[in-house]
Amino acid sequence: RLETCGKPVVAALNGTALGGGLEMALACHYRVAVNNPKAKFGLPEVKLGLLPGGGGTQRLPRLIGIQNSLPLMMEGKELSAEKAKGAGIINALASDNDDMMKQAREWCQANPKATAPWDAKGFKYPGGDAKHPAVVQVLAIAPSMLRDKTKGNFPAPENILASVVEGSLVDFDTGLDVEARYFADLVVSQVSKNMINTFWYQLNALNKGDSRPKGFDRSEVKKLGILGAGMMGAGIAYVSAKAGIEVVLKDVSQEAADKGKAYSEGLLDKGMKRGRVTNSQKEELLGRIKATDKVEDLSGCDLIIEAVFEDRDLKASVTKETEAVMDANGVFASN
């Protein structure tokens, strides 16, 4: 109805549009979004064992092409506003809400008889439909690659592929019927029911703390000790310091401990080159990581994580050594 109402319809997006939200936007004639770095755009239904059942498997391929749209739907990728615009999903970016509404009104005034591309006479798929030689080359190997990856246990990507391919060979309205049949096949399957239960209901319950012991206050780690500055220890140190936790990274020698801390520095340097990390942020994070070979520096840690080499005697040794300096209410964990 939006597409064929005879009036220009613009989707003004001031935040995230995933799943049905983006499908509604795709049914509009134009999409303008606020360039909010936290906003995400995509069709992630495959993560729940489903396919985009609101026209997503028909509109997105007709908008950006079969080859470009399949990875977004079959992998459930979520894009930033800038990447969504680069992919052709978003038509324009706005600096704020006022700019977004201004652009939306201007586009409506400039396009009083807007129609969706696929409703225009002579419409052709960007990059070709499923019969185009370039697309055929991809589709010829896609099923076998998909089967190798899913082992036949994950039907959603297969149904997405089938819906897109079959839908490209018929008119748009018939394509919606094709999509509806493949969606119905998934929504009643045990696979999707299990995935929805696990990744929606159970995960939301976990995030709300339903599995936490009752009658205990929430604990907070302010100082974390890590035994072993190898790959695992260095990685734990980085993510912990990034979360604002003071970290003591201990190894058998100062050189080894410094090498573990250097891992965090390397990641931050890469972030600076990409413009995602400032120098002050880098220094602040590195300042939270104390590399040491002295067990005394672990004193006062709320949590100590053992991440040393998989050797029973070594693990026993570092555990015994650490017990002497552990906080009375501290927790000792093994990675």
Model-predicted regions and their roles:
Residues 57-67:
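Hydrophobic, secondary-structure "cap" segments at the distal end of domains
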Residues 23-29, 67-182, 199-201, 205, ...:
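Amphipathic alpha-helical segments at domain termini/boundaries
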Residues 2-48, 52, 228-236:
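Glycine-rich beta-to-alpha active-site loop
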Residues 207-270, 290:
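NAD(P)+-binding Rossmann beta1-loop-alpha1 motif at the extreme N-terminus of oxidoreductases
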Residues 1-14, 56-59, 195-219, 283:
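An acidic, glycine-rich surface segment that forms the CoA-thioester-binding/catalytic face
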Residues 139, 255-259, 270-334:
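Rossmann-like NAD(P)-binding element
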Residues 182-195:
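Long amphipathic alpha-helix in the N-terminal Rossmann-like dinucleotide-binding domain
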Residues 12-13, 44, 227, 235, ...:
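Structural motif
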